[in-house]
A protein has these predicted regions:
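Class I SAM-dependent methyltransferase Rossmann-like catalytic core
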Residues: 2-53, 65
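S-adenosylmethionine/decaboxylated-SAM
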Residues: 50-308
Length: 309
């Protein structure tokens, strides 16, 4: 009932915009698709954890709510502040209609239409730190990476298989065993189930390093080098059997806290919905409920999707 009410309120532009404006003011959040807890994590990581043994890469920076706290924290850290390193900020910088919800309650509401370029907005928001940010505008599948070691890889760009394969192929080879951190910002989001299959595939190389509360972000430490044949493979739905899907999601569900269980469970349902296998999706949804996963958050979202013809 509560989740249904929240969804209805979101459909009112005025109510949703007012709520988002008050929420950001109260929590002192930057405008973006990140929570205050995520923004705080990036700042603390930059200040306290970064060691200077590799580059910092932000895949999917949008309006800078990941980039800005990262740089603010890093500038308090001599390993970054006394170096010539920059944060590499990747984005298409092309506006899509679904972004309007995150812009609600700001001067950006209604400013951009589908297909507009907003890189100047990013530059305006990050101008204080411009000399420590290198903007990589465009399709990361085409831009790629230069090959330098990466110490911190923030991934908010695995929105489909092509992008996921590009991140694995172009960025994972530059991770440093025992040093690198990978933060998956969509790990606990229903739409991106391939993240779970890939992290399970690479489970011998990554160690779970925690999660960011009140967010969809989960953190991994890179421990062992991934075999070249695994990095160069072109993954797809067809790459995995149903048994492997079960194993991958059992792995993920055992990693995360109770807070994130409904969203990870929803991603498993979405694995089948993405392939138009509705009966399998419905059966999986029922199985997850029988396992005691609460019907809330993203699991409620996929329930509504299953109820639509």
């Amino acid at each position: 009932m509560l989740q249904s009410l929240k969804n209805k309120l979101k459909k009112s532009a005025f109510i949703h915009g007012t709520y988002m404006r008050l929420k950001r003011a109260f929590a002192q959040e930057l405008v973006g698709m990140t929570s205050k807890t995520e923004q705080d994590y990036f700042a603390v990581y930059g200040e306290k954890t970064y060691s200077g043994k590799g580059e910092i890469v932000d895949l999917g920076c949008w309006l800078g709510s990941t980039t800005i706290p990262l740089v603010k924290g890093l500038l308090k850290n001599p390993a970054f502040a006394e170096s010539n390193r920059k944060v590499y900020a990747y984005d298409l910088f092309i506006w899509f209609e679904w972004m309007n919800e995150s812009a609600a309650g700001t001067r950006l509401a209604g400013k951009y239409k589908e297909g507009d370029n907003f890189v100047e907005e990013f530059k305006a928001r990050t101008k204080e730190f411009a000399r420590r940010i290198e903007i990589r505008e465009g399709d990361l599948k085409q831009i790629g990476w230069s090959g330098e070691n990466i110490e911190f890889l923030l991934v908010d760009a695995m929105k489909n298989w092509d992008l996921a394969n590009a991140v694995v192929r172009d960025f994972y080879p530059s991770l440093v065993p025992g040093e690198s951190i990978v933060l998956h910002q969509d790990y606990a989001h229903f739409f991106t189930p391939w993240i779970h299959l890939l992290q399970w595939t690479f489970r011998e190389s990554f160690a779970f390093a925690g999660e960011v509360p009140k967010s969809q972000s989960v953190i991994f430490r890179y421990e062992n080098k991934i075999a070249g044949e695994l990095l160069n493979k072109n993954y797809s739905f067809e790459s995995f059997s149903d048994r492997e899907v079960d194993s991958a999601f059992d792995y993920s569900l055992n990693l995360v806290s109770t807070e994130k269980l409904p969203n990870v469970a929803a991603a498993k349902v979405m694995w089948f919905l993405h392939q138009n296998e509705r009966e399998k999706a419905k059966a999986e949804f029922e199985n997850l409920l029988k396992r005691g996963i609460p019907l809330e958050k993203d699991l409620f979202v996929v329930k509504e999707m299953l109820e639509k013809e």
